[in-house]
Amino acid sequence: MTRALYFVLPLALMSQTPHHDPLYKRLQRLYFLSVQSATYLQPFEDTLQILAARYGPYPTIQMYRYGALALKARYATNLLKKKDYLYAAIASMDAQVARTPNDPEVRFLRGSFYYYLPFFLGKRKAAQDDIQTLVTLLETQTQDLTQLYDKEVLRAMADFIAQTGWVEETRVKKLRQRYSL
């Protein structure tokens, strides 16, 4: 009987969403810290590997994997590797958004990455589209999103939306009120 449990448990874990897993919360925090400092990149990647093994190719986990490529591009000193990481991140993120266009975290991750890219890479329109889609999702899926995400994550999304200047101030204010931020 115990042997059967060894096979069922991994399948049961993979069938659930990772959003309520404490390790997923750690992944989110490590990603934001990795954006600010390369010292967090390895712990972020280690956590990402554990979650990928636990949940399989879940869309947001895949997107964080592509975010890791973007971070490697940011911190790489070799220009050829930097270019390779950058273009791999862009292609992978575009493909993930095409597969899951209505996932707010997927849109947030790509939109925040593209926002900081130089204009000559031609990703400004995609970033604006991601932010507008994210706002619409936050406005229309309040109940679902408050169950999936901590206030800290929703606050980061709302703050970033405000920072872009691409969304009317009244909509940003309503978002912050809606999520009690």
Where are these regions (language model features)?
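Structural register within alpha-helical repeat arrays
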Residues: R65, K72, R110, A156-I161
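TPR/TPR-like (Sel1-like) alpha-helical repeat modules
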Residues: D84, I90, G122-T140, R176-L181
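Terminal, low-structured helical/coil segments at or just beyond the last alpha-helical repeat
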Residues: T140-L181
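Short coil/turn linking the two alpha-helices of tandem helical-hairpin repeats
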Residues: F32-V35, L71-L80, Y116-L121, G165
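N-terminal leader/linker segments that initiate helical-solenoid repeat arrays
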Residues: T17-E45
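Helix-turn-helix repeat elements of alpha-solenoid scaffolds
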Residues: S34-T47, K82-A91, K123, D130-I131
